[in-house]
């Protein structure tokens, strides 16, 4: 695939207009705002930095690297083990439901784009969008580092725009937050991708509590 086309497809994967429910989930932020843990843009930035460092860098990116290698090797057994590990790291029913819902939605796109995707891989991709991204990245010859940039930007933008609705703060503040969070992400992405097996795992008790409490929150803008 020519390089310009790869770049355009990478931008398409980063777009939050993809019909995978990117704006439908708050990952506990809605309860954190309700509880008074996140009251302004500075508190949101601190909250999101913690999620990035203690969850996204500790689980999502290391597992993306392993799923990518499994897809390169055509090894669905290895991909299945890491997909199951990813789901086990989602500490609440809400987070596991989000993972599976986004995976199922992304797989519908994947099958439309690549109808030759084998059935055993489709089944795995339905469990997690991360698995689908890895498979598609290998098929489209997009490097794992470029794929990680796309995934990270989409995650950051979704979180910041959720904050616009919930905290709230304005659009100018949102763009400043995206720039600062992206700078932090870019500085640490490579080391996160190189995380050894024994170091994979997250410890975000406040985020887990917020997600669990959000399941029964009286009034919600976001899915549970």
UniProtKB/Swiss-Prot annotation:
GO terms for molecular function: nickel cation binding. This is Urease accessory protein UreF. The lineage of its organism: Bacteria, Pseudomonadati, Pseudomonadota, Gammaproteobacteria, Enterobacterales. GO terms for cellular component: cytoplasm. PANTHER family: UREASE ACCESSORY PROTEIN F. It comes from Escherichia coli O157:H7. The gene is ureF1. InterPro entries: UreF, UreF_sf. It is found in: Cytoplasm. Transmembrane segments: none annotated.
């Amino acid at each position: 695939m020519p390089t310009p086309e790869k770049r355009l497809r990478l931008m398409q994967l980063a777009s939050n207009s993809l019909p995978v429910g990117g704006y439908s989930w708050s990952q506990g932020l809605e309860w954190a705002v309700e509880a008074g843990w996140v009251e302004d843009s500075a508190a949101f930035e601190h909250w999101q930095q913690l999620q990035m460092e203690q969850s996204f860098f500790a689980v999502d990116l290391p597992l993306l690297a392993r799923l990518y290698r499994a897809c390169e090797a055509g090894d669905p057994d290895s991909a299945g083990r890491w997909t199951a590990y990813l789901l086990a790291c989602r500490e609440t029913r809400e987070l596991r439901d989000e993972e599976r819902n986004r995976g199922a939605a992304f797989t519908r796109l994947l099958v439309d784009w690549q109808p030759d995707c084998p059935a055993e891989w489709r089944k795995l991709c339905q469990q997690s969008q991360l698995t689908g991204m890895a498979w598609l990245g290998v098929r489209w010859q997009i490097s794992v580092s470029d794929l990680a940039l796309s995934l990270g930007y989409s995650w950051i933008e979704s979180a910041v725009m959720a904050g616009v609705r919930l905290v709230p703060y304005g659009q100018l503040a949102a763009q400043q937050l995206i720039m600062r969070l992206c700078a932090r992400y870019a500085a640490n992405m490579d080391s996160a991708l190189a995380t050894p097996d024994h170091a994979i795992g997250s410890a975000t008790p406040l985020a887990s509590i917020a997600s669990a409490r959000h399941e029964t929150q009286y009034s919600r803008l976001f899915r549970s």
